[in-house]
Amino acid sequence: MESKIYKMELAGRELSFEIGKYALLANGAVLARYGDTAVLVTACASEKPREGINFFPLTVDYEERLYSVGKIPGGFIKREGKPSEKAILSARLIDRPIRPLFPKDFYHDVSVIATVLSVDPDNPPDVLAMLGSSVALSISDIPFEGPTGSVLVGYVDGKIVINPTAKEREVSKLHLVVSGTKDKVMMIEAGAQEIPEDIMLEAIMTAQEEIKKIVEFIEGIVKEVGKPKMQYEKRVVPEEIKQKVRELAYEKAYQYVQIPDKIERDKKLDELKEEVLKAFEGETEDTLLLVDDALYNLEKEIVRKMIAEEGKRPDGRKFDEIRPLYAEVGILPRTHGSALFKRGYTQVLTVATLGTKGEMQFLDGLEEEEAKRYMHHYNFPPYSTGESKPVRGPGRREIGHGALAERALEPVIPSEDEFPYTIRLVSEVLTSNGSTSQASVCGSTLALMDAGVPIKAPVAGISIGLITKEDGSFITLTDIQGIEDFFGDMDFKVAGTREGITAIQLDIKIHGLTKEIIEKALYQAREARLKILDFMQTVIDKPRSELSPYAPKIFKTTVDPEKIRDIIGPGGKMINKIIAKTNVKIDIEPDGRIFVAAPDDISGNRAISMIEGIGREIEVGQFFLGKVTRTASYGAFVEIYPGKEGLVHISQLDNKKLKSVDEVVKVGDLVLVKVIGIDRLGRIALSRKEALNVTYSRKAK
């Protein structure tokens, strides 16, 4: 195929797709460029479907290459290793809008790989990779009902900005990624500084207008170079199996899905499944898979009809009703802050830990090195769903949910000047029945307040579900539980304060959302969020006034940056001496800010005093109470501050003439001295004689 380049203007910059030159054996491949950012995206599919599965086997990988920013990987191996957290989140961004657009009966393995080749800070590669994935799939022979378009949206100086530059992103109150088809929204991912619902909706719809132009542009490319879509073997459930499953299961399934208690409901539905499969005993594995499909479709039909036509939810709640709430704080005595948050069966334990500045997380990826002083980690162990399987490291879903909760709380975390601690939150999902990520947002707020972190406002989260009808009408459901998420059309997670939204994550299973659905979901989420915040503030209404006795105490001082060298001392001698004497941790910033983490107030204040002493300017005429460190025939050396010594000449030790220094002082004595001179080399001359008639209280003044 002849190489072709297609170009369009997007937000004042050139967007281009080069096709037919790279990765020639892939089903679809494109080199996407935006400014100086370049990403190669490929799409490949297996020739045959994977056997024995009832899910779509799509994998998306986002490969960061450090050469794209002119860096060589650190460490001994000097090559890229496992994907970073940012790479995993970017892969999820690519995956979520395209997954619903594959045929439901397509079971071939599909692999989408985005390789970042060059990065321009003004043009983030993740959004470009999303566009590249849409092009690669659309021009390939893989069945795909796209194309999609994607943009980044900012809110700068009261204006909505499409694809903001690096400088604009620094001051933007909104970081919103929207993906969609020509007329509907497929995916939303947002972090915001308490943005009101009306502005958020305007930003989403402004993005949709740009997405429409992108999709029309990609459609033109597909008309020119797109391959015919492959024919594939469709797995269709025969009518006789459908009918038999319906006869065996309909009445019981209708009865069981309405059992309010999740444990009892799941038990009965599992028993029904066993009963149905037993009726097909002796059939092939392929037939049993079709039976499983038929039973799934039957249960889905019942739940959706029950909600849409009868106005009933499985647990009997109203459409806008939240499950029963329960919360408790301070449940773990030795942690710095802890909270248990429960919504229905969903139960999350969140623990807050306060650390020193030196415990921040340093990120060295495609962007400039960044230090994170606030982190949120989310764990989803197998027991939370009653399963027995090995515990592995965090998966993509756990990393994604942790990032969502982190983003939700970030706008209310106090600045380093207000609260000089590193903050780590860990949410342990103890029981899962829908909306665990939003429960972790609520639990995190409570744990921070229990830890005494002066957050700017409490944050709560809620998930809104959706049931669409054949006539185009729809029903939105507040606080969806597992069965509603499983059989519903969307999971629209919204977190925020009373003032506005701080985070959004939208996942859907249908071919997009209209403005009406998004607007209804945003305002329904706000109504629920305010109710949850009211409840949370009955548990703890404001951050505790004191930190846990087990949390480190952090003290802060500022010195002249030129004095940092003296505070550290040759080979770290001086700072290590302070640490050894006071049992503290010390972090020094290049601008002269110094943070001291101590086990108690006495140690912290002592360390600060020693540091300030070293950084202090000594002036002639000042008095100090110092310790004699050594003596010589010509005088005594007195340490007036850690690292600051002066000489009291023998003639300045006493009013009378002395034969020996030892007549008046010896090593270890505390003596009051006066500064009588400082030479050009910084050597300090002291006098005990001139301080003999001065009291210590006068010196303190």
From Swiss-Prot:
Which SUPFAM superfamilies would you find in this protein's record? Eukaryotic type KH-domain (KH-domain type I), Nucleic acid-binding proteins, Polynucleotide phosphorylase/guanosine pentaphosphate synthase (PNPase/GPSI), domain 3, Ribonuclease PH domain 2-like, Ribosomal protein S5 domain 2-like
Q: So where does Mg(2+) get bound? A: 485, 491
- Which Pfam families is this protein grouped with? KH_1 (PF00013), PNPase (PF03726), RNase_PH (PF01138), RNase_PH_C (PF03725), S1 (PF00575)
Where does it primarily localize? cytoplasm
Gene Ontology molecular function: any one: magnesium ion binding
Q: Where in the cell is it found?
A: Cytoplasm
Q: Which ranges does the record mark as transmembrane?
A: none
Q: What is its EC number?
A: 2.7.7.8
Q: Which GO terms describe its cellular component?
A: cytosol
Q: Which cofactor does it need?
A: Mg(2+)
Which InterPro entries does the entry mention? ExoRNase_PH_dom1, ExoRNase_PH_dom2, ExoRNase_PH_dom2_sf, KH_dom, KH_dom_type_1, KH_dom_type_1_sf, NA-bd_OB-fold, PNPase
Q: Which reaction does it catalyse?
A: RNA(n+1) + phosphate = RNA(n) + a ribonucleoside 5'-diphosphate
Q: Does the keyword ATP-binding apply?
A: no
Where the record annotates domain S1 motif, the positions are 621-689
What task does this protein carry out? Involved in mRNA degradation. Catalyzes the phosphorolysis of single-stranded polyribonucleotides processively in the 3'- to 5'-direction.
Tell me what this protein is called: Polyribonucleotide nucleotidyltransferase
| Organism in which the protein naturally occurs | Caldicellulosiruptor saccharolyticus (strain ATCC 43494 / DSM 8903 / Tp8T 6331)
